From Swiss-Prot:
Its EC number(s): 2.3.2.-
Gene Ontology CC: chromosome, telomeric region; cytoplasm; cytosol; early endosome membrane; endoplasmic reticulum membrane; nuclear matrix; nuclear membrane; nucleolus
Cross-link (Glycyl lysine isopeptide (Lys-Gly) (interchain with G-Cter in SUMO2)): K65, K160, K380, K394, K401, K460, K476, K478, K487, K490, K497
Species of the source: Homo sapiens (Human)
Protein known as: Protein PML
Length: 882
């Protein structure tokens, strides 16, 4: 028989039957499976069979032979129990640890089956004498035997038991028959030395056994623990009833959560259907080559649905399992109360009590989760941007045909590696009317060496022109109208090597790869496999024209803050970057001291995408002013705007909302690796602090698998470069003038440099990939760096050993004299580079700082020592992880 719905109001529904997390199939008729040997039952037989369906095995639905009661209160036959292993095949509940036996003989079900079998024989008029096999006429309730008239006379001659004719019993209902057989059960003394069973009415609570009068008198040690056995049975039945009543409250709580989860699953399905329909409607309006984007969006929606559905299904399954156990226990106690004998109650009470106690310990609150069905909003946003950008691109194509000046403006770079791919993309562009001549930089390759630019001139695309004025933009447009050759990737022979090197810059270093790789193209429309660069929302003082049709995939988020100080302090920032370049290289270098995370050495690390990540910090406010990330397919950008411009820019949002969009961008990928150019700079600690303020740092940790230090990696691949500033590397190897004020320009330069150097995820990057815990420890040590008691390089070395601020503070609190000395061994590599007069680890300054911190925040501020209360949350989290 198929499982019935979980909350069906039908009276014949059995709560102990198996259920499915989703809507189960309807019940099938039970005819054809009855084990009764009678081919023609009476009219009462089908009703009784339907009522006692709970006696069947709940796994195979056959009549249970040797029924076994599991700890989860499901009943199985012996065959299904042997095949189930160490867990219930119905609710998948494992056997409890320390249980003597995984299952109990269900003597209640076995006795009830035996009595029902006798009743069927009586009703079917095919009962035969137990002794002589003749047609039976009487039933002895004491011996539980069918007797013919002849055997009945002999039986009554010796035993004088109560026996009733079968004709009288056939007129009784099954309940009346079972009630009569139940009341005749007697309890005998548990002493096995009695020759004949002795009836008893005494129960010893010390021995937990029924005793006859003789055994009770001989057992003098438990004289005060003996009671009437009827009172003991009544007390145990009342205890089980009380536990059942308590479980009713849990049934209501679990039922409410179960209903909420069912509603959430339905809402999730409706949201999925609405999103898919919206996607299909919009995609029908675009041209043929955008259908690749439609498939990508549908797959992303389905992936999000599958991820959310699996999480909800697992919780729903857990709720179903607990509800099944609660209802099975309640039903079993009620049936035992109706049909079980006194001996059966005594035998099964302890097992039932343990199972019901475990059920009472279940808490539905721990199973509740914040059900989010709004996760499809980001796909709607991407769809809106895609549709609007394509529509604007078509309008721009018409204006470009009429305006040669607009048509000659260089477009954003994309990457098309194969010639046939380039021809296909070119054909699509010509079909849209977007194919125009574009100025390109020529990059040539030398056999055995590395690609270097033959010549380079400034090509200011809209994505990199944040710091260019209107005059410069106009000059750039005039310059770009001249006819320039397209970009050429060419393998040069040995004969022309010297001449080519003479025309190119001989002093320029070359990246350490032996294969010529095409840098990003600067013309052509976006292909489905190539990322496109979108428009950027600028401040009112940046009068730039946004990019055209190649900007479909980028999501632009404007965050509430200020960017005015970024423009004022750009020159000082460039000086700081230039002066600290050597120290950054030393700080960013690979370290052999750190222990690699197991996740980073995973053979499946190649499947984790690289996401190039950068952010800009305002020098005055020390807040995030820009944030950008890019992978092979899509880009994410955050531009800061003052709150005064919220009414002007429709996409202006708060910092919290912007960070949430960035977390959604990361969660759409499979735990990517974040590649940062200056990994150990002040940017990530500020970023961690912003996430900590909105309590989303844990979500960021789960969304990524580690951090890649891009600067030492590029330094390793191009050891002879004259400067490792990202702007100089982009100008040398990408023929690109990169704006240092743009986070998007930085991540695009990093991505294209890594493409040129053939950097791809895998075990070969393990020495440059750092776990989240190391960067979190580094962020927690920033108050010490800002207080000038711990150099940043030493903070990095401590972070590589997962030493956090709270660990240092705890060590000093335990031993104020020598508690910090043990951390000097982590800095042994640093001591060789310092002058003898300067200790590698200024224990005195650090101890003084902690002393002021322990004496009180007010005293510490009075002495001029900064108190790192703002970073305490990060410090505590890093300490727990380390």
């Amino acid at each position: 028989m198929e499982p019935a719905p979980a909350r069906s109001p039908r009276p014949q529904q059995d709560p102990a039957r198996p259920q499915e997390p989703t809507m189960p199939p309807p019940e099938t008729p039970s005819e054809g499976r009855q084990p009764s040997p009678s081919p023609s039952p009476t009219e009462r037989a089908p009703a009784s069979e339907e009522e006692f369906q709970f006696l069947r095995c709940q796994q195979c639905q056959a009549e249970a032979k040797c029924p076994k009661l599991l700890p989860c209160l499901h009943t199985l036959c012996s065959g299904c129990l042997e095949a189930s292993g160490m867990q219930c095949p119905i609710c998948q509940a494992p056997w409890p640890l320390g249980a003597d036996t995984p299952a109990l003989d269900n003597v209640f079900f076995e006795s009830l089956q035996r009595r029902l079998s006798v009743y069927r024989q009586i009703v079917d008029a095919q009962a035969v004498c137990t002794r002589c096999k003749e047609s039976a006429d009487f039933w002895c309730f004491e011996c539980e035997q069918l007797l013919c008239a002849k055997c009945f006379e002999a039986h009554q001659w010796f035993l004088k038991h109560e026996a009733r004719p079968l004709a009288e019993l056939r007129n009784q209902s099954v309940r009346e028959f079972l009630d009569g057989t139940r009341k005749t059960n007697n309890i005998f003394c548990s002493n096995p030395n009695h020759r004949t069973p002795t009836l008893t009415s005494i129960y010893c609570r010390g021995c937990s056994k029924p005793l006859c009068c003789s055994c009770a008198l001989l057992d003098s040690s438990h004289s005060e623990l003996k009671c009437d056995i009827s009172a003991e049975i009544q007390q145990r039945q009342e205890e089980l009833d009380a536990m059942t009543q308590a479980l009713q409250e849990q049934d209501s709580a679990f039922g409410a959560v179960h209903a909420q989860m069912h509603a959430a699953v339905g809402q999730l399905g409706r949201a999925r259907a609405e999103t898919e329909e919206l996607i299909r409607e919009r995609v029908r309006q675009v041209v043929a080559h955008v259908r690749a984007q439609e498939r990508e969006l549908l797959e992303a929606v389905d992936a999000r649905y599958q991820r959310d559905y699996e999480e909800m299904a697992s919780r729903l399954g857990r709720l179903d399992a607990v509800l099944q156990r609660i209802r099975t226990g309640s039903a079993l106690v009620q049936r035992m109360k109706c049909y079980a004998s006194d001996q059966e109650v005594l035998d099964m009470h302890g097992f039932l009590r343990q199972a019901l106690c475990r059920l009472r310990q279940e808490e539905p609150q721990s199973l509740q989760a914040a059900v989010r069905t709004d996760g499809f909003d980001e796909f709607k946003v991407r769809l809106q941007d895609l549709s609007s950008c394509i529509t604007q691109g078509k309008d721009a194509a018409v204006s470009k045909k009429a305006s040669p000046e607009a048509a000659s403006t260089p477009r954003d770079p994309i990457d098309v590696d194969l010639p046939e791919e380039a021809e296909r993309v070119k054909a699509q562009v010509q079909a849209l009317g977007l194919a125009e001549a574009q100025p390109m930089a020529v990059v040539q390759s030398v056999p055995g060496a590395h690609p270097v630019p033959v010549y380079a001139f400034s090509i200011k695309g809209p994505s990199y022109g944040e710091d260019v004025s209107n005059t410069t933009t106009a000059q750039k447009r005039k310059c770009s109208q001249t006819q320039c050759p397209r970009k050429v990737i060419k393998m040069e022979s040995e004969e022309g090597k010297e001449a080519r090197l003479a025309r190119s810059s001989p002093e320029q270093p070359r990246p350490s790869t032996s294969k010529a790789v095409s840098p990003p193209h600067l013309d052509g429309p976006p292909s489905p496999r190539s990322p496109v660069i979108g428009s950027e929302v600028f401040l009112p003082n940046s009068n730039h024209v946004a990019s055209g049709a190649g900007e479909a995939e980028e999501r632009v988020v404007v965050i509430s803050s200020s960017e005015d100080s970024d423009a004022e302090n750009s020159s000082s920032r460039e000086l700081d970057d230039s002066s600290s370049e050597s120290s950054d290289l030393q700080l960013e270098g690979p370290s052999t001291l750190r222990v690699l995370d197991e996740n980073l050495a995973d053979p499946q690390a190649e499947d984790r995408p690289l996401v190039f990540f950068d952010l800009k910090i305002d020098n005055e406010t020390q807040k995030i002013s820009q944030l950008a990330a890019v992978n092979r397919e899509s880009k994410f950008r955050v531009v800061i705007q003052p709150e005064a411009f919220f009414s002007i820019y429709s996409k202006a949002v708060s910092l919290e909302v912007g960070l949430q969009h960035f977390l959604s961008f990361l969660s759409s990928m499979r735990r990517p690796i974040l590649a940062c150019y200056k990994l150990w700079g002040p940017g990530l600690p500020n970023f961690f602090r912003a996430l900590e303020d909105i309590n989303r740092l844990w979500e960021f940790q789960e969304a990524i698998s580690g951090f890649l230090a891009a600067l030492p990696l590029i330094r390793e691949r191009v050891p002879g470069a004259s400067s490792f500033k990202l702007k100089n590397l982009a100008q040398t190897y990408l023929a690109r003038n990169m704006s240092e004020r743009s986070a998007m320009a930085a991540v695009l330069a990093m991505r294209d440099l890594c493409r040129l150097l053939e950097v791809s995820p895998g075990p070969q990057l393990a020495q440059h990939v750092y776990p989240f815990s190391s960067l979190q420890c580094f962020a927690s040590l920033q108050p010490l760096v800002q207080a000038a008691v711990l150099p940043r390089a030493e903070a990095r070395l401590l972070a590589l050993h997962n030493v956090s601020f709270m660990e240092l503070l705890s060590a000093h609190r335990r031993d104020r004299q020598g508690g910090l000395k043990k951390y000097s061994r982590y800095l042994s590599l640093q001591t060789t580079t310092l002058p003898p007069a300067q200790p590698a680890f200024n224990l005195q300054a650090l101890g003084t700082y902690f002393e002021g911190l322990l004496e009180g925040p007010a005293l510490a501020r009075a002495e001029g020592v900064s108190t790192p209360l703002a970073g305490r949350g990060l410090a505590e989290r890093a300490s727990q992880q380390s």
